[in-house]
Curated annotation (Swiss-Prot):
InterPro entries documented for this protein: HAD-like_sf, HAD-SF_hydro_IIB, HAD_sf, OTSB-like, Trehalose_PPase
Catalytic activity, reaction form: alpha,alpha-trehalose 6-phosphate + H2O = alpha,alpha-trehalose + phosphate
Induction statement: By trehalose.
UniProt name for this protein: Probable trehalose-phosphate phosphatase G
Organism: Arabidopsis thaliana
GO molecular function annotation: trehalose-phosphatase activity
Gene Ontology terms describing biological process: trehalose biosynthetic process
Taxonomic lineage of the native organism: Eukaryota, Viridiplantae, Streptophyta, Embryophyta, Tracheophyta
Length: 377
């Protein structure tokens, strides 16, 4: 893929739309991938006029502080709209009997986001630690169902945070996936190679954006430099994508964050910018997302037969919508949105926060135990 094509602006994704045994497993000279744009540096009004600020605000619902460093979304005061939303996206806990009925004679496969799903949303991403109780619940789920975590974080980082060898891990929004070697043959894809994990076991490593690693590293370093004077801004490198967090930035400085990221990314036409929960994500322009990652994992793990398996994806972020959409449109499973704030989604069910996710997972384990005991006789 030729990264140096004759374009001078990045792809800006969805700027105005408010709203998805071990399995784990050198930079080029600065400027190589940069495009020398001759366009005049835009004024600050650009990010206001093109919808960026609207997108930043819509992806950042109001919150209230509970305890130090932890936040929880505030549900709207309009009880009617809240009830109407819950009718459209009923609680996965109170609807569990219906979920169990859908899973009759099928094997469930569980896919989980990390931040905001298994761990609370916190001011400092480095402190997004899942509780021991949540880790135990996920570990129990993996005893009965194939379980994977698909996170926007790097695969190594999310494995470090979760620390369970029973799971499958996909990082960078699914652009870095490690799975066991399929005895019936590995996917015939140039982006899929055989390697060994941390325990020395042979695994398949799928990285559809591996050629972008140098440019992501370059952009990360540049974004750190150009945002270092903005109090509260934090830039993270997730190997195949990078993120600029503005959760701790004074709202009056949001336009400055947006403008600096926007201006810099004009030099990289093969990168796009998307909006998450108080974060700007920079990622390669490739046809890959969490939905594609779910499909890849189902195929790689031999779980793609709709008549035999029921995939469930639990997530809280806009990026999880791609996975929800794949399951909904393929009539092969369903998504569960983690949110206490009404918003449109491709999910079928909802949970308010990570504490309800834990409760749902425990309920799923109880059901799994019961079903397992039936088949043992």
């Amino acid at each position: 893929m030729d990264l140096n094509i004759n374009k001078t602006t990045p792809v800006l994704s969805d700027p105005t739309t408010p709203v998805s045994k071990t399995r784990l497993g050198s930079s080029f000279p600065s400027g190589r991938f940069m495009m020398n744009s001759r366009k005049k540096i835009p004024k600050l009004d650009d990010v206001r006029s093109n919808g960026w600020l609207d997108a930043m605000i819509s992806s950042s619902p109001p919150r209230k502080r509970l305890v130090k460093d932890f936040n929880i979304e505030i549900a709207p005061e309009d009880d009617f709209s809240q009830r109407a939303w819950m009718l459209k996206y009923p609680s996965a806990i109170t609807s569990f009997a219906h979920i169990a009925a859908q899973a009759k004679n099928k094997k469930i496969a569980v896919f989980l986001d990390y931040d905001g799903t298994l761990s609370p949303i916190v001011d400092d991403p480095d402190r997004a630690i899942m509780s021991d109780a949540m880790r135990a619940a996920v570990k129990d789920v993996a005893k009965y169902f194939p379980t994977a975590i698909i996170s926007g974080r790097s695969r190594d980082k999310v494995y470090q945070l979760v620390g369970l060898t029973e799971l499958y891990y996909a990082g960078s929004h699914g652009m870095d996936i490690m799975t066991p070697v399929n005895p019936n043959g590995s996917p015939e894809d140039p982006n899929c190679i055989k390697t060994t994990d941390q325990q020395g076991e042979e695994v398949n490593l799928f990285q559809p954006a591996k050629e972008f690693i140098p440019v992501i590293e370059e952009v990360y370093n540049n974004l750190v430099e150009i945002t270092k004077c903005i109090k509260g801004a934090k830039v993270e490198n997730h190997k195949f994508c990078t993120s600029v967090h503005y959760r701790n930035v004074d709202e009056k400085d949001w336009p400055l964050v947006a403008q600096r990221v926007h201006d810099h990314l004009k030099r990289y036409p093969r990168l796009r910018i998307t909006h998450g929960r108080k974060v700007l994500e920079v990622r390669p322009v490739i046809e890959w997302n969490k939905g594609k990652a779910v499909e890849f994992l189902l195929e790689s793990l031999g779980l793609s037969n709709n008549d035999e398996f029921l995939p469930i994806f639990i997530g809280d972020d806009k990026t999880d919508e791609d996975a929800f959409k794949v399951l909904r449109e393929g009539n092969r499973g369903f998504g569960i949105l983690v949110s206490s704030v009404p918003k449109e989604s491709n999910a079928f069910y909802s949970l308010r926060d990570p504490s309800e996710v834990k409760k749902f997972l425990k309920t799923l384990v109880k059901w799994g135990k019961m079903e397992s005991s039936k088949t043992s006789f």
